[in-house]
A protein has these predicted regions:
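Short runs of predominantly hydrophobic/aromatic residues within well-ordered alpha helices
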Residues: 66, 120, 345, 397, ...
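Hydrophobic residues within the alpha-helices of tandem HEAT/HEAT-like
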Residues: 88-91, 123-131, 171-179, 320-325, ...
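Alpha-solenoid helical repeat scaffolds
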Residues: 2-8, 17-21, 35-40, 44, ...
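Amphipathic alpha-helical protein-interaction segments enriched in hydrophobic
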Residues: 394-399, 445-459
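Long amphipathic alpha-helical scaffold regions
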Residues: 1-232
Length: 561
């Protein structure tokens, strides 16, 4: 019988002096007591545990019973006055805090995903009680505990929002006494107090990364006061409470400190992902925005946010929210010397061209256009030139060339003359626009957007900028443009039309033919003859559209005096 075995081992241990118990004693005590608990004999175990004669035995060995007790309490959902719960509470009072903490954290780490919520919620209060028993030397153990809890909460199934909400709320209650202590002692200059403040900072940074970085709120402009919003609000409040300035954290990359007190290296203390999400919470969801000073200029805030935007580009709401605060035509060209002012739009182009979700591609295009609008004239010139060289996508190149046309149109209006979209500076940009990516062998269908916008720009220049004025310089370079752009384009058009007309004839003669198309080494469904013919007609119509604009340009040139 387990009860008899437990009584025997306890009686034998009572005779041992100075708590010199052997590993075998520990094993026998744990096995017998666990079996009693599992078999429902918790009353007998409780009587042994609370017996004053066994106090030293329980203090040394009792922590081994935490695991079995937690499993029983979670499984059986026993009431608050049950023997098992009484045993658990008594162990928390008399056992070594360090050994209890290890045992409790083992239970947290061992929890399977389907019981993480129940395990975490049950153990938060015992863990808090044990940590408070460490006194002023709790910081390291608190950090270990918070890291374990957050790692387990991150393993919750994504669909378990209720469980995540409970755990986040419970976690805030758990850290409350430690936060208050860190607030009260933040200027004490004592090493233990600084370590506690550092652990609270680590907790906030970890929380900003997970769960807050991996989860979406509701609509940024119409969000409910959800548990996630409340959790984020409290995390930012803790940061402020322990002496971390939110504006300084936001501008951390720009105003990086070289000497940081404490034992953490800077990149560990202030992870980039956490700081990026801090900016996202501030400027997209307006959490704790009332603490942010209004004296900081929108341009400075944008500059601070660019590092964060680069990390969070899939959520380019932060880019948009940072840009809308900036006045149009106000960003100086010097900002383009900062790497992120080029890399962020380049990455945004990837979203615009590669993202499978139409809504996100459209939103990306709108933000890209917004970024163009914010630069001054010289900034627009250099930004558009850089993007035209690096985008390598006809649709994006078409958007860029259309923006160039709009800037030229603006510069030709009375009172808006500038040196960047006229004359000597404009001609190199125009040469870049009026070129075929692969010369006469360029795929006209694949490059349709770029080619049509290039032709529209050239036609506009020839009509709007009279040869007698020649403000843009286009008339001086006309022969060069004819040789490098229009003649190769005409040759390309003739070859493409001949090829597709031949294909159309073949398709009409062989009505039984089936066309197979492969993409990425995978065959797509075969095209029927009717679909083939329709596609060929569509291509020929596109060539006629290109040719009509090209002919109009040639007519304008021929009609010059």
């Amino acid at each position: 019988m387990a009860v008899d075995q437990l009584s025997d081992i306890v009686q034998r241990c009572q005779t041992i002096q100075d708590d010199l118990y052997t590993p075998e004693d520990y094993d026998l005590f744990q096995c017998a007591a666990r079996k009693c608990i599992e078999e429902g004999d918790s009353v007998h175990v409780l009587s042994i545990i609370v017996d004053e004669k066994n106090k030293h035995i329980v203090r040394c060995m009792g922590w081994n019973l935490v695991g079995p007790l937690v499993l029983v309490l979670l499984k059986n959902e026993e009431n608050s006055v049950s023997p098992s719960r009484a045993i658990f509470s008594h162990l928390l009072e008399i056992c070594s805090p360090k050994e209890l903490l290890v045992s409790l954290l083992e239970q947290v780490e061992a929890a399977e995903p389907d019981v993480i919520r129940d395990t975490v919620m049950f153990l938060l209060q015992p863990l808090q009680k044990v940590l408070l028993n460490f006194g002023r030397k709790k910081a390291t153990f608190l950090g270990m505990t918070l890291s374990t809890l957050l790692n387990q909460i991150a393993r919750l199934p994504q669909e378990d929002t209720a469980g995540l909400g409970q755990c986040c709320s419970g976690l805030l209650c758990f850290v409350k006494p430690f936060v208050e202590e860190a607030k009260d002692t933040r200027n004490s200059g004592v090493a233990h107090d600084e370590e506690l403040r550092t652990e609270m900072l680590k907790f906030c940074m970890m929380s900003l990364r997970d769960p807050l970085l991996g989860l979406q709120f509701t609509d940024p402009d119409q969000q409910d006061k959800s548990f996630l919003c409340e959790f984020a609000t409290e995390i930012l409040a803790i940061l402020s409470g322990i002496g971390e300035s939110l504006p300084e954290l936001l501008c951390h990359e720009l105003l990086k400190k070289h000497e940081v007190p404490g034992f953490l290296e800077e990149e560990v203390r202030y992870p980039k992902e956490s700081l990026a999400n801090l900016a996202y919470l501030l400027f997209v969801h307006h959490i704790a925005m009332e603490t942010f000073p209004v004296v900081l200029s929108p341009v400075f805030i944008l500059q601070c946010n660019m590092e964060h935007i680069e990390l969070l580009l899939s959520r380019y709401d932060l880019y948009e929210k940072s840009l809308v605060r900036v006045e149009d035509n106000s960003l100086s060209v010097e900002l383009l010397e900062i790497k992120t002012f080029i890399s962020v739009p380049q990455n945004l182009v990837k979203v615009m061209t590669l993202c499978p979700v139409h809504r996100l591609r459209s939103k990306g295009l709108a933000v890209f256009q917004l970024s163009i609008n914010k630069f001054n004239t010289e900034g627009k010139y250099k930004f558009l030139r850089c993007m035209l060289k690096t985008s390598h996508h006809s649709g994006v190149e078409g958007v860029i060339i259309k923006n160039i046309k709009n800037q030229v149109d603006l510069s030709l209006r009375p009172g808006n003359k500038n040196v960047w979209f006229q004359g000597i500076h404009f001609l190199p940009l125009l040469r870049l626009v009026l070129s075929l990516p692969q010369g006469p062998e360029t795929d006209l269908l694949q490059n349709l957007d770029r080619i049509m916008e290039s032709l529209n720009l050239l036609r506009y220049l020839l009509i709007r900028d009279k040869e007698s004025d020649n403000e843009t310089g286009v008339w001086l370079e006309l022969q060069a443009f004819n040789d490098s752009f229009m003649t190769p384009l005409r040759l390309d058009l003739n070859m493409s039309k001949a090829h597709y007309q031949a294909e159309l004839s073949n398709a009409g003669c062989d009505s039984e033919s089936v066309c197979t198309v492969s993409v990425g080494n995978e065959n797509l469904p075969n095209l029927t003859p009717e679909v083939q013919i329709q596609a060929l007609h569509s291509a020929l119509f596109t060539f006629e559209l290109i040719e009509s604009v090209l002919v109009r340009i040639e007519e304008i040139i021929e009609a010059k005096p």
